[in-house]
Amino acid sequence: MKVVLLIDHFGAGGAQRQMAGLACLLKERGVDVSVYTYFSYNFYVEQLKQSGVPYEVVKGAESHWRRFFYLRKKLLAAQPDWVVAYLDTPCIMASLVNWLGGKFRLIVSERNTTQTLTRRERLKFWLYRNADYIVPNSYSQGDFVCKHFPQHKAKTVVIPNFVDLDKFACATERHRQQPAVILVVASIWASKNTKGFIDAVRLLRQHRNDFVVKWFGRDLRSTIPKNTAYAQECQRKIKEYGLEDTVFLYPKTKQIAEEYRKADYFCLPSFYEGTPNVLCEAMASSLPVICSRVCDNPKYVFEGENGFLFDPYDVKDMAAKLDEALQLSEALHAGYGRCSRAIAEEKMSEQVFVDRYLSLLRAPHDGQAE
Protein backbone atom coordinates (compact mmCIF):
# COMPACT_ATOMS: atom_id res chain seq x y z
CA MET A 1 0.00 0.00 0.00
CA LYS A 2 1.44 3.35 -1.12
CA VAL A 3 0.29 6.44 0.79
CA VAL A 4 1.06 10.11 0.11
CA LEU A 5 0.46 12.66 2.87
CA LEU A 6 -0.17 16.24 1.72
CA ILE A 7 0.05 19.42 3.80
CA ASP A 8 1.07 23.04 3.19
CA HIS A 9 4.37 22.99 5.13
CA PHE A 10 6.08 21.61 8.22
CA GLY A 11 6.26 24.76 10.31
CA ALA A 12 5.45 24.75 14.03
CA GLY A 13 1.71 24.13 13.75
CA GLY A 14 -0.60 21.60 15.34
CA ALA A 15 -1.72 19.98 12.08
CA GLN A 16 1.90 19.74 10.97
CA ARG A 17 2.85 18.04 14.23
CA GLN A 18 0.09 15.46 13.81
CA MET A 19 0.92 14.75 10.16
CA ALA A 20 4.61 14.31 10.93
CA GLY A 21 3.62 11.88 13.65
CA LEU A 22 1.21 10.03 11.37
CA ALA A 23 3.92 9.65 8.72
CA CYS A 24 6.39 8.19 11.21
CA LEU A 25 3.81 5.86 12.77
CA LEU A 26 2.70 4.54 9.37
CA LYS A 27 6.35 3.99 8.43
CA GLU A 28 6.84 1.96 11.63
CA ARG A 29 3.85 -0.21 10.62
CA GLY A 30 5.45 -1.01 7.26
CA VAL A 31 3.40 1.35 5.08
CA ASP A 32 5.10 2.86 1.99
CA VAL A 33 4.51 6.48 2.98
CA SER A 34 5.88 9.78 1.68
CA VAL A 35 5.06 13.42 2.39
CA TYR A 36 4.58 16.38 0.03
CA THR A 37 4.39 20.07 0.95
CA TYR A 38 4.53 23.26 -1.11
CA PHE A 39 6.21 25.64 1.35
CA SER A 40 9.64 24.97 2.84
CA TYR A 41 9.14 25.59 6.57
CA ASN A 42 11.02 22.78 8.27
CA PHE A 43 10.17 22.70 11.99
CA TYR A 44 9.25 18.97 11.90
CA VAL A 45 11.33 17.80 8.94
CA GLU A 46 14.11 16.35 11.12
CA GLN A 47 11.55 14.03 12.72
CA LEU A 48 10.65 12.69 9.27
CA LYS A 49 14.29 12.19 8.35
CA GLN A 50 15.02 10.29 11.55
CA SER A 51 12.19 7.89 10.75
CA GLY A 52 13.24 7.48 7.12
CA VAL A 53 10.09 9.07 5.68
CA PRO A 54 10.64 10.56 2.18
CA TYR A 55 9.77 14.25 2.16
CA GLU A 56 9.57 16.67 -0.75
CA VAL A 57 8.65 20.31 -1.28
CA VAL A 58 6.85 20.39 -4.65
CA LYS A 59 8.64 23.05 -6.66
CA GLY A 60 6.37 25.58 -8.35
CA ALA A 61 3.42 24.74 -6.10
CA GLU A 62 4.25 27.61 -3.74
CA SER A 63 2.58 29.87 -6.33
CA HIS A 64 -1.10 30.35 -5.57
CA TRP A 65 -1.98 30.43 -9.27
CA ARG A 66 0.12 27.41 -10.31
CA ARG A 67 -0.32 25.26 -7.21
CA PHE A 68 -3.01 22.96 -8.54
CA PHE A 69 -1.14 22.15 -11.76
CA TYR A 70 2.13 21.28 -10.04
CA LEU A 71 0.44 19.25 -7.33
CA ARG A 72 -1.68 17.41 -9.89
CA LYS A 73 1.40 16.52 -11.92
CA LYS A 74 3.20 15.29 -8.81
CA LEU A 75 0.33 13.24 -7.42
CA LEU A 76 -0.48 11.62 -10.76
CA ALA A 77 3.18 10.70 -11.26
CA ALA A 78 3.41 9.20 -7.76
CA GLN A 79 0.45 6.86 -8.40
CA PRO A 80 -0.42 6.37 -4.72
CA ASP A 81 -3.16 4.07 -3.50
CA TRP A 82 -4.19 6.73 -0.97
CA VAL A 83 -3.73 10.45 -0.44
CA VAL A 84 -4.28 11.84 3.06
CA ALA A 85 -4.59 15.66 3.14
CA TYR A 86 -4.54 17.95 6.18
CA LEU A 87 -5.84 21.56 6.26
CA ASP A 88 -8.26 23.31 3.91
CA THR A 89 -6.13 24.22 0.89
CA PRO A 90 -4.33 20.84 0.66
CA CYS A 91 -7.71 19.10 1.05
CA ILE A 92 -9.22 21.22 -1.73
CA MET A 93 -6.21 20.59 -3.99
CA ALA A 94 -6.28 16.84 -3.39
CA SER A 95 -10.05 16.76 -4.01
CA LEU A 96 -9.67 18.62 -7.31
CA VAL A 97 -6.89 16.31 -8.47
CA ASN A 98 -9.04 13.34 -7.49
CA TRP A 99 -11.89 14.74 -9.57
CA LEU A 100 -9.64 15.45 -12.58
CA GLY A 101 -7.81 12.24 -13.29
CA GLY A 102 -6.64 11.03 -9.90
CA LYS A 103 -7.01 7.28 -9.42
CA PHE A 104 -6.18 7.33 -5.72
CA ARG A 105 -8.51 6.96 -2.76
CA LEU A 106 -8.74 10.03 -0.57
CA ILE A 107 -8.92 10.99 3.11
CA VAL A 108 -9.47 14.68 3.86
CA SER A 109 -8.94 15.80 7.44
CA GLU A 110 -10.72 18.68 9.15
CA ARG A 111 -8.30 20.22 11.68
CA ASN A 112 -10.40 22.97 13.27
CA THR A 113 -13.99 23.83 14.10
CA THR A 114 -15.85 25.71 11.39
CA GLN A 115 -17.20 29.01 12.69
CA THR A 116 -18.94 30.36 9.57
CA LEU A 117 -20.27 28.62 6.47
CA THR A 118 -18.62 30.77 3.82
CA ARG A 119 -18.78 30.12 0.08
CA ARG A 120 -15.31 28.60 0.31
CA GLU A 121 -16.44 26.22 3.03
CA ARG A 122 -19.47 25.16 1.00
CA LEU A 123 -17.28 24.59 -2.07
CA LYS A 124 -14.85 22.54 0.00
CA PHE A 125 -17.56 20.24 1.33
CA TRP A 126 -19.06 19.93 -2.16
CA LEU A 127 -15.66 18.75 -3.42
CA TYR A 128 -15.55 16.21 -0.60
CA ARG A 129 -18.26 14.22 -2.41
CA ASN A 130 -15.60 12.01 -3.98
CA ALA A 131 -13.49 11.61 -0.83
CA ASP A 132 -13.57 8.17 0.75
CA TYR A 133 -13.45 9.57 4.28
CA ILE A 134 -13.71 12.91 6.03
CA VAL A 135 -11.68 12.76 9.24
CA PRO A 136 -12.24 15.61 11.72
CA ASN A 137 -9.84 15.70 14.66
CA SER A 138 -12.62 16.81 17.01
CA TYR A 139 -16.08 15.53 17.83
CA SER A 140 -17.46 19.06 17.63
CA GLN A 141 -16.36 19.35 13.98
CA GLY A 142 -17.67 15.86 13.28
CA ASP A 143 -21.06 16.94 14.62
CA PHE A 144 -20.89 20.09 12.48
CA VAL A 145 -20.20 18.13 9.30
CA CYS A 146 -23.01 15.65 9.96
CA LYS A 147 -25.49 18.43 10.79
CA HIS A 148 -24.78 20.72 7.84
CA PHE A 149 -23.78 18.10 5.27
CA PRO A 150 -25.78 14.97 6.17
CA GLN A 151 -24.87 13.39 2.84
CA HIS A 152 -21.34 12.98 4.26
CA LYS A 153 -22.40 11.40 7.55
CA ALA A 154 -21.61 7.78 6.60
CA LYS A 155 -18.01 8.60 5.69
CA THR A 156 -17.24 11.02 8.53
CA VAL A 157 -14.93 9.38 11.07
CA VAL A 158 -13.53 11.33 14.03
CA ILE A 159 -9.89 10.58 14.89
CA PRO A 160 -8.69 12.83 17.75
CA ASN A 161 -5.05 13.87 18.05
CA PHE A 162 -2.41 11.65 19.60
CA VAL A 163 0.36 12.58 22.00
CA ASP A 164 3.78 11.01 22.53
CA LEU A 165 3.26 9.59 26.02
CA ASP A 166 6.99 8.96 26.48
CA LYS A 167 8.17 12.41 25.43
CA PHE A 168 5.44 14.26 27.32
CA ALA A 169 5.68 12.76 30.78
CA CYS A 170 6.60 13.88 34.28
CA ALA A 171 8.80 11.25 35.92
CA THR A 172 8.22 12.41 39.49
CA GLU A 173 5.23 13.48 41.59
CA ARG A 174 4.48 17.15 41.07
CA HIS A 175 5.27 19.63 43.84
CA ARG A 176 3.94 23.12 43.25
CA GLN A 177 6.47 25.92 43.08
CA GLN A 178 6.33 29.36 44.62
CA PRO A 179 5.38 31.34 42.69
CA ALA A 180 3.27 28.83 40.77
CA VAL A 181 3.94 28.67 37.02
CA ILE A 182 0.91 28.82 34.71
CA LEU A 183 1.94 27.66 31.25
CA VAL A 184 0.15 28.65 28.03
CA VAL A 185 1.24 27.19 24.69
CA ALA A 186 -0.57 28.89 21.81
CA SER A 187 0.03 31.35 19.02
CA ILE A 188 -0.53 34.96 19.99
CA TRP A 189 -3.56 35.47 17.79
CA ALA A 190 -7.02 36.90 18.37
CA SER A 191 -8.61 33.43 18.23
CA LYS A 192 -6.36 32.31 21.10
CA ASN A 193 -7.76 35.12 23.30
CA THR A 194 -4.42 36.44 24.51
CA LYS A 195 -5.79 39.90 25.30
CA GLY A 196 -8.71 38.50 27.27
CA PHE A 197 -6.33 36.31 29.24
CA ILE A 198 -4.13 39.31 30.08
CA ASP A 199 -7.24 41.13 31.32
CA ALA A 200 -8.07 38.13 33.54
CA VAL A 201 -4.54 38.08 34.96
CA ARG A 202 -4.88 41.78 35.75
CA LEU A 203 -8.01 41.04 37.81
CA LEU A 204 -6.33 38.13 39.57
CA ARG A 205 -3.28 40.18 40.48
CA GLN A 206 -5.49 42.59 42.42
CA HIS A 207 -5.65 40.08 45.28
CA ARG A 208 -2.82 37.59 44.77
CA ASN A 209 0.69 37.64 43.37
CA ASP A 210 1.81 34.06 43.97
CA PHE A 211 1.96 33.06 40.29
CA VAL A 212 3.63 33.84 36.98
CA VAL A 213 2.50 33.13 33.42
CA LYS A 214 4.77 31.75 30.72
CA TRP A 215 3.10 32.00 27.31
CA PHE A 216 5.02 30.26 24.52
CA GLY A 217 3.73 31.26 21.10
CA ARG A 218 5.39 34.39 19.71
CA ASP A 219 6.11 33.96 16.00
CA LEU A 220 9.25 35.94 15.28
CA ARG A 221 8.97 35.15 11.55
CA SER A 222 5.37 36.23 11.09
CA THR A 223 4.70 38.41 8.05
CA ILE A 224 0.93 38.59 8.62
CA PRO A 225 0.20 42.20 9.64
CA LYS A 226 -2.90 41.47 11.75
CA ASN A 227 -1.06 38.82 13.80
CA THR A 228 1.97 41.06 14.31
CA ALA A 229 -0.27 43.97 15.34
CA TYR A 230 -2.18 41.75 17.78
CA ALA A 231 1.03 40.56 19.44
CA GLN A 232 2.18 44.16 19.80
CA GLU A 233 -1.14 45.11 21.41
CA CYS A 234 -0.67 42.29 23.92
CA GLN A 235 2.79 43.56 24.83
CA ARG A 236 1.36 47.06 25.32
CA LYS A 237 -1.37 45.71 27.61
CA ILE A 238 1.19 43.90 29.75
CA LYS A 239 3.17 47.11 30.15
CA GLU A 240 0.09 49.28 30.71
CA TYR A 241 -1.18 46.94 33.46
CA GLY A 242 2.22 46.68 35.14
CA LEU A 243 2.40 42.92 34.54
CA GLU A 244 5.96 42.79 33.19
CA ASP A 245 6.99 40.67 36.19
CA THR A 246 3.98 38.34 35.85
CA VAL A 247 3.23 37.64 32.17
CA PHE A 248 6.09 36.60 29.90
CA LEU A 249 5.58 36.06 26.15
CA TYR A 250 8.17 33.70 24.67
CA PRO A 251 8.83 32.48 21.10
CA LYS A 252 7.73 29.03 20.01
CA THR A 253 10.24 26.36 21.00
CA LYS A 254 11.10 22.76 20.13
CA GLN A 255 11.92 22.16 23.81
CA ILE A 256 8.33 22.58 24.95
CA ALA A 257 8.25 19.18 26.70
CA GLU A 258 10.68 20.52 29.29
CA GLU A 259 8.47 23.57 29.85
CA TYR A 260 5.50 21.32 30.65
CA ARG A 261 7.63 19.50 33.22
CA LYS A 262 8.66 22.80 34.83
CA ALA A 263 5.10 24.18 35.01
CA ASP A 264 2.44 23.79 37.71
CA TYR A 265 -0.70 24.43 35.65
CA PHE A 266 -1.68 24.57 31.99
CA CYS A 267 -4.11 27.15 30.62
CA LEU A 268 -5.70 27.47 27.16
CA PRO A 269 -8.10 30.45 26.85
CA SER A 270 -9.00 30.06 23.14
CA PHE A 271 -12.37 31.04 21.71
CA TYR A 272 -12.44 27.79 19.70
CA GLU A 273 -10.26 24.75 19.05
CA GLY A 274 -10.35 21.34 17.44
CA THR A 275 -8.59 18.83 19.65
CA PRO A 276 -5.61 20.95 20.74
CA ASN A 277 -2.22 19.25 20.59
CA VAL A 278 -1.10 21.34 23.51
CA LEU A 279 -3.98 20.15 25.69
CA CYS A 280 -3.00 16.55 24.96
CA GLU A 281 0.64 17.30 25.78
CA ALA A 282 -0.18 19.11 29.01
CA MET A 283 -2.40 16.29 30.22
CA ALA A 284 0.21 13.66 29.32
CA SER A 285 2.65 15.76 31.36
CA SER A 286 0.40 15.40 34.43
CA LEU A 287 -0.70 19.03 34.62
CA PRO A 288 -3.99 20.32 36.03
CA VAL A 289 -5.77 22.14 33.20
CA ILE A 290 -7.62 25.47 33.17
CA CYS A 291 -9.25 26.06 29.78
CA SER A 292 -12.20 27.50 27.91
CA ARG A 293 -15.46 25.57 27.82
CA VAL A 294 -15.52 25.21 24.03
CA CYS A 295 -15.62 22.47 21.41
CA ASP A 296 -14.01 19.22 22.62
CA ASN A 297 -12.32 20.60 25.74
CA PRO A 298 -15.08 19.30 28.08
CA LYS A 299 -14.49 15.77 26.73
CA TYR A 300 -11.01 15.80 28.29
CA VAL A 301 -11.19 18.31 31.14
CA PHE A 302 -13.51 17.46 34.04
CA GLU A 303 -14.14 19.93 36.84
CA GLY A 304 -13.38 18.46 40.22
CA GLU A 305 -11.17 15.78 38.64
CA ASN A 306 -8.38 17.20 36.47
CA GLY A 307 -9.18 20.83 35.77
CA PHE A 308 -11.39 23.89 35.46
CA LEU A 309 -13.52 25.24 32.59
CA PHE A 310 -14.46 28.87 31.94
CA ASP A 311 -16.32 31.06 29.47
CA PRO A 312 -13.60 32.61 27.25
CA TYR A 313 -15.78 35.69 26.68
CA ASP A 314 -16.10 36.34 30.43
CA VAL A 315 -12.89 37.77 31.89
CA LYS A 316 -14.24 37.56 35.45
CA ASP A 317 -15.07 33.87 35.03
CA MET A 318 -11.60 33.21 33.65
CA ALA A 319 -9.97 35.00 36.58
CA ALA A 320 -12.18 33.12 39.05
CA LYS A 321 -11.20 29.72 37.64
CA LEU A 322 -7.51 30.64 37.68
CA ASP A 323 -7.99 31.64 41.31
CA GLU A 324 -9.71 28.33 42.16
CA ALA A 325 -6.87 26.39 40.58
CA LEU A 326 -4.25 28.28 42.56
CA GLN A 327 -6.18 27.51 45.77
CA LEU A 328 -5.91 23.72 45.34
CA SER A 329 -4.23 21.94 48.21
CA GLU A 330 -0.95 20.17 47.48
CA ALA A 331 -2.71 16.80 47.58
CA LEU A 332 -5.48 17.89 45.21
CA HIS A 333 -2.99 19.54 42.86
CA ALA A 334 -1.06 16.28 42.56
CA GLY A 335 -4.28 14.30 42.18
CA TYR A 336 -5.52 16.50 39.34
CA GLY A 337 -2.20 15.91 37.57
CA ARG A 338 -2.46 12.13 37.94
CA CYS A 339 -5.99 12.22 36.56
CA SER A 340 -4.87 14.23 33.52
CA ARG A 341 -2.20 11.63 32.78
CA ALA A 342 -4.66 8.74 33.11
CA ILE A 343 -7.08 10.38 30.64
CA ALA A 344 -4.24 10.97 28.17
CA GLU A 345 -3.12 7.35 28.39
CA GLU A 346 -6.66 6.13 27.74
CA LYS A 347 -7.69 8.48 24.93
CA MET A 348 -4.60 9.97 23.27
CA SER A 349 -2.08 7.20 22.63
CA GLU A 350 -0.13 6.83 19.38
CA GLN A 351 -1.39 3.26 19.01
CA VAL A 352 -5.06 4.26 19.15
CA PHE A 353 -4.41 7.05 16.62
CA VAL A 354 -2.54 5.02 14.00
CA ASP A 355 -4.83 2.00 14.38
CA ARG A 356 -7.81 4.19 13.51
CA TYR A 357 -6.09 5.49 10.38
CA LEU A 358 -5.02 1.99 9.35
CA SER A 359 -8.60 0.76 9.70
CA LEU A 360 -9.58 3.33 7.05
CA LEU A 361 -6.62 2.68 4.77
CA ARG A 362 -7.32 -1.07 4.84
CA ALA A 363 -11.08 -0.76 4.35
CA PRO A 364 -12.45 -2.23 1.10
CA HIS A 365 -13.61 0.17 -1.57
CA ASP A 366 -17.04 1.56 -0.61
CA GLY A 367 -16.66 -0.22 2.71
CA GLN A 368 -17.01 1.40 6.08
CA ALA A 369 -14.32 1.75 8.70
CA GLU A 370 -14.15 -0.73 11.51
Regions found by a protein language model. Give the residues of each.
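Conserved donor-binding/catalytic core segment of Leloir-type glycosyltransferases
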Residues: 4, 174-192, 197-201, 213-214
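Acidic anion/phosphate-binding donor-loop and adjacent secondary structure
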Residues: 63, 146-147, 160-178
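Short His-centered aromatic/hydrophobic patch
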Residues: 85-91, 110
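A short, active-site helix/loop in glycosyltransferases that binds the activated sugar's phosphate group
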Residues: 131-156, 163-167
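Nucleotide-activated donor-binding/catalytic signature segment of Leloir-type glycosyltransferases, i.e.
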Residues: 228-251
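Aromatic "clamp/platform" in nucleotide-sugar-dependent glycosyltransferases that forms part
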Residues: 252, 271
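Short hydrophobic beta-strand element within catalytic cores of glycosyltransferases
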Residues: 288-291, 301
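Conserved acidic donor-binding segment of nucleotide-sugar-dependent glycosyltransferases
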Residues: 303-304, 308-315, 324-330
